[in-house]
Amino acid sequence: MELFKHQQEALEQTKDLNRVAYYLDMGLGKTFVGAEKAMSLDKDILIVCQKSKIADWKEHFFKYYIDKMKCDESGAWCYDLTSNTGMDMFLHSRYKIRIGVINYELAWRRQTELLNLHDFTLMLDESSLIQNQGAKQSKFILKLNPDNVILLSGTPTAGKYENLWSQIHLLGWKISEDVYNRQYVNWTKIDMGGFVHKIVDKENPYKNVGRLKSKLREHGAVFMKTEECFDLPEQTFIKQFVPASKEYWKFMKDCIITIDDKELVGDTTLTKRLYARQLCGQYSEYKLQAFRELVESTQDRLIVFYNFTAEYLAMVQIAEELGRPQSIVNGQQKQLLNYEQCDNSITFIQYQAGIE
């Protein structure tokens, strides 16, 4: 496997470290860097990622590592830990390197098995998802006992340094949360209905930022922006596949289904094709979850093309829940204010409207 120059540089910078963070922009190949580092440490590997990425991680390890090894106990094998069978096979595997992949939401529910792991490498894909140290999944991950840690994220804090402490803790920087907040974050108090709340100062939120970044690099963090990597192709295409739902397959078989109190009847070739597309769009939990995970994984400006109004409304709800400003271009309106003013905006464009 041949890595890009910037990926080789990231590995070279951290070659002597066993706790590292690769904060690389989307499209720079964090998966390749993280996997290469993990395999070089020669330990069992536990990967925690978004649910939609489990198959991608398994495919990556089989394609670039396992399929090129001997199929015996001196090699490696990768297991999906979301099933009881996969977890049991992982725990009792006799391969030299056991690789287990599990999603954040399920990991903390597998405490009995995972808290007993020792002498392993923990790799967190989209490590920004543990920034809320009060959440169950974050608390659990901080309880694990890995020998090595690899953090992967394009937006480790979304620019909010007050959310960085959990990742700092995993990198081995021995600073308490209280001291960290006093040294690097400017807090202010506000009165809300007689209750005093502490919030980050809006005008001057952070302090000692240069020292903070220096300490992060000292503890294995590599920051890399797209514009710094001149050897990249001009465009990077990333295909994200999602499975078709059981409702889709039932409709394709029977040509009729009731979903969300609405009956879809494919009594002609045209209506069947139309409803099939809707079942893969606004009615697809898999596709909407993949969209949510994409938005969570980056603070870049996003442009999303859509077909149906119901599909747009479902995605807008997700964007609002995640606090992302939106713009819209369709047959009824053209509002680009947030696109022009907010660098983390999401612009929704209806296909036909986008052509005009």
PLM regions with names:
Residues 1-23:
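Conserved pre-motif I regulatory segment
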Residues 17-37:
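Walker A/P-loop
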Residues 18-21, 127, 133-134, 164-168, ...:
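Interdomain linker/hinge connecting the two RecA-like lobes of the SF2 helicase core
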Residues 33-36, 42-63, 158-163, 306-312:
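Conserved Walker A/P-loop ATP-binding site and its immediately adjacent core
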Residues 44, 63, 75, 89, ...:
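Conserved P-loop NTPase motor "coupling/switch" region that bridges the ATPase
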Residues 53-84, 171-175, 323:
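Conserved helix-turn-beta segment of the N-terminal RecA-like "Helicase ATP-binding" lobe
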Residues 303-305, 312-355:
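Conserved helicase ATPase core of P-loop NTP-dependent helicases/translocases
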